[in-house]
Structures are given as structure tokens and as C-alpha cells.
């Protein structure tokens, strides 16, 4: 399957950003409505996620802020939304999810959110996301040009996210999806390039490494969507580098370094807000989502890197003490 900047979880993150209205979630569980998702789970794990692998080609999606709506409009109106530049590379994932949704007679919006929660559950260290079912099908495509790109300045990114009800802290937390991400389309010369050194683990290594001084481009590309990376074979998005160093977000970014529980909680809360915007009276089927494998190892400097390589942009609090290690886990 063709892959791009984000794994599937990022696809879900950005599919939900610009659908806003009041949220009224049900606290009850409907056995009939939830039980069908056990069958969906089994098929996704076997046929999409390769028996529960975290890093799989089937998990990857596109661009930094691509996507349609949490109502599944990107699937319902694929012919329209897949033409948007921000959705480059999503074609195969969109049509794959359409196949599964049609086969199980569930809505496209529900399928996007469920598959994202299941995908994340396969990654050690990730939070267990809640899943609410009952989204109706979309009745119109998402408008174009709603979501920012990796080439956009931080102010524009934060402004767009604020329009959707997400503050700067939410934005930084949602970027945790990049801890289990790879790119293919920004620089096709280096397919499957990870955005940190632990792409199979949902951890805070991404937040540390994005603050390390960039020294090289990993491939042949020198486009405006990427910045120099600190490690061979590691890719860095220009927007990630900018958000990590911006005065509005630098301290929030730094706060997640070696703070696994803090990141898990912040990401989970932001995803609940994102996944359920624009819908009411959804049914709680969270019990169907598997419990992710644990991961509690501390963050480490990659081989050859140390505190002197950090470009600290938050002056309010000291930088956390990080151990040196020549073998970062993958």
C-alpha cells in the first residue's frame, strides 16, 4: 500500500479537525450496535493491520493536515476530497476503508474512527482511545483548503486549529501521531522514512528528537515541507520543527519530553474531542478497542547526541535530564 507522511492514526486525526458542533455522548452501551464491531475488529486486525502490527503499510496515510470530516465525507465524497492537495496519498487507504465499511454495513465516519483507535492500540505505549458509534453518513463534501499544510507558518496552523476548537496545547498533543509515522510522498527518494527513531512505539522520543539540531537532509529532496534532521534516515517536517520552537508552543512541546503519561492523557483527551465533534447521541462501544501493549522506558538521546544538540526554545522551565544511549529502541 502506498504510504505517506502519517500512519493511519494521523489520517483519523486530520479527518476530524474541521467538523464542529455540540457534542452529546451517550453513557450507555447498546449490545447489538457494539457487538458488530467485534467482527470488524477481527477483520481489520487480520486483513489490514497484519495481525496487530503497529508499523504496517496499511496504517499509513497522507500529508500533515490532510483529511475531510469526522462524518466520513472523505470516503463518501472521495472523488471530490481526494483531489484536494492536502489529501495526496490517501487514495488507497480511503478505498480500503470503504470496502470494510460497506462489507459490515457501518457508516464511513464510524469506520474511520474505529480503525484509527484499533490501529493505535497495536502500538506499545499508546493510550486506549474511546470509540463511540452511530455517526450518520455525510451529506456533503468537506470544503477545500480548510486545513493547513507542512509548509504553513505556525501562526496559520494554530489559527486554523483554533477555528476548529483546538488550542495550541491540543495541537501539540495531536502531533504525537508523528511518533509512529513515516513519509513517502514529500521525498519519494526515501520511502518509509520515520519521523523519529522509534516509529513502532507511541512515545515521547519524537518530541525530544524534533528539538535536536538538524544537520542533514536524509534524501534527495530539499523542499519547503521538510527541515534538516539530526539523524541519518530520519525525516523532519518543516511544520514540526517550527511548532517545536515557536513561542506559543515551545513550552507545551518540551513538557511532553520524557512524560509518557502526560502525553498519553493529553492525546487521548484531544482525540475524544476530535473524534466526536459534529455528532450527538453516539453510543459508547469503547470496550471493543483492545488494550495497547505497555511501554514505560525513558527517553534517550540517540547515538552521538547530547544536551548540547538541543535547540531549547522554552525558557520558562529547565530542560529535562535525558540519558545518553547508543541504542535507541525501535
Swiss-Prot record:
Annotated glycosylation sites: 27
More about this protein: In comparison to other ligninolytic peroxidases, lacks a Mn(2+)-oxidation site (as in manganese peroxidases (MnP) and versatile peroxidase (VP)) and an exposed tryptophan responsible for high redox-potential substrate oxidation (as in lignin peroxidase (LiP) and VP).
EC number: 1.11.1.7
Claim: Disulfide bond is one of the keywords in the record: yes
Residues annotated to bind Ca(2+) 1: 69, 71, 73
PANTHER family attached to this UniProt entry: CATALASE-PEROXIDASE (PTHR31356:SF66), THYLAKOID LUMENAL 29 KDA PROTEIN, CHLOROPLASTIC-RELATED (PTHR31356)
Keywords associated with the record: Calcium, Disulfide bond, Glycoprotein, Heme, Hydrogen peroxide, Iron, Metal-binding, Oxidoreductase, Peroxidase, Secreted, Signal
Cofactor note: Binds 2 calcium ions per subunit.
Taxonomic lineage of the native organism: Eukaryota, Fungi, Dikarya, Basidiomycota, Agaricomycotina
Classification via Pfam families: peroxidase, Peroxidase_ext
GO molecular function: heme binding; lactoperoxidase activity; metal ion binding
Organism of this sequence: Taiwanofungus camphoratus (Poroid brown-rot fungus)
InterPro entries registered for this protein in UniProt: Ccp1-like, Haem_peroxidase, Haem_peroxidase_sf, Ligninase, Ligninase_C, Peroxidases_heam-ligand_BS
Descriptive protein name: Low-redox potential peroxidase
PROSITE patterns xrefs: PEROXIDASE_1, PEROXIDASE_4
Amino acid at each position: 500500500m502506498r504510504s505517506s507522511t502519517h500512519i493511519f492514526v494521523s489520517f483519523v486525526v486530520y479527518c476530524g479537525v474541521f467538523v464542529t458542533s455540540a457534542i452529546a455522548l451517550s453513557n450507555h452501551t447498546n449490545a447489538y450496535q457494539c457487538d458488530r464491531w467485534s467482527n470488524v475488529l477481527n477483520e481489520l486486525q487480520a486483513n489490514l493491520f497484519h495481525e496487530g502490527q503497529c508499523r504496517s503499510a496499511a496504517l499509513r496515510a497522507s500529508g500533515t493536515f490532510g483529511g475531510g470530516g469526522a462524518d466520513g465525507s472523505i470516503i463518501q465524497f472521495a472523488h471530490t476530497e481526494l483531489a484536494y492537495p492536502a489529501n495526496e496519498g490517501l487514495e488507497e487507504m480511503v478505498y480500503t476503508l470503504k470496502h470494510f465499511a460497506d462489507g459490515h454495513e457501518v457508516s464511513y465516519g464510524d469506520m474511520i474512527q474505529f480503525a484509527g483507535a484499533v490501529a493505535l492500540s497495536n502500538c506499545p505505549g499508546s493510550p486506549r482511545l474511546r470509540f463511540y458509534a452511530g455517526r450518520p453518513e455525510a451529506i456533503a463534501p468537506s470544503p477545500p483548503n480548510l486545513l493547513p499544510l507542512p509548509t504553513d507558518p505556525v501562526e496559520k496552523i494554530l489559527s486554523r486549529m483554533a477555528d476548529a476548537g483546538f488550542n495550541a496545547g491540543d495541537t501539540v498533543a495531536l502531533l504525537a501521531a508523528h511518533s509512529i509515522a513515516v513519509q513517502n510522498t514529500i521525498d519519494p527518494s526515501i520511502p518509509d522514512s520515520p519521523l523519529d527513531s522509534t516509529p513502532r512505539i507511541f512515545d515521547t522520543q519524537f518530541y525530544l528528537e524534533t528539538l535536536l539540531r538538524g544537520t542533514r537532509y536524509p534524501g534527495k529532496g530539499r523542499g519547503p515541507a521538510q527541515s534538516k534532521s539530526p539523524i541519518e534516515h530520519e525525516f523532519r517536517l518543516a511544520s514540526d520543527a517550527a511548532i517545536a520552537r515557536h513561542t506559543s508552543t515551545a513550552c507545551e512541546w518540551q513538557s511532553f519530553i520524557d512524560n509518557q503519561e502526560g502525553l498519553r492523557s493529553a492525546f487521548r483527551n484531544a482525540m475524544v474531542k476530535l473524534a466526536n465533534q459534529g455528532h450527538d447521541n453516539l453510543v459508547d462501544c469503547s470496550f471493543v478497542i483492545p488494550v495497547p501493549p505497555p511501554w514505560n522506558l525513558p527517553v534517550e538521546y540517540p547515538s552521538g547526541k547530547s544536551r548540547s544538540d538541543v535547540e531549547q526554545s522554552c525558557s520558562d522551565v529547565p530542560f529535562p535530564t535525558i540519558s545518553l544511549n547508543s541504542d535507541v529502541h525501535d
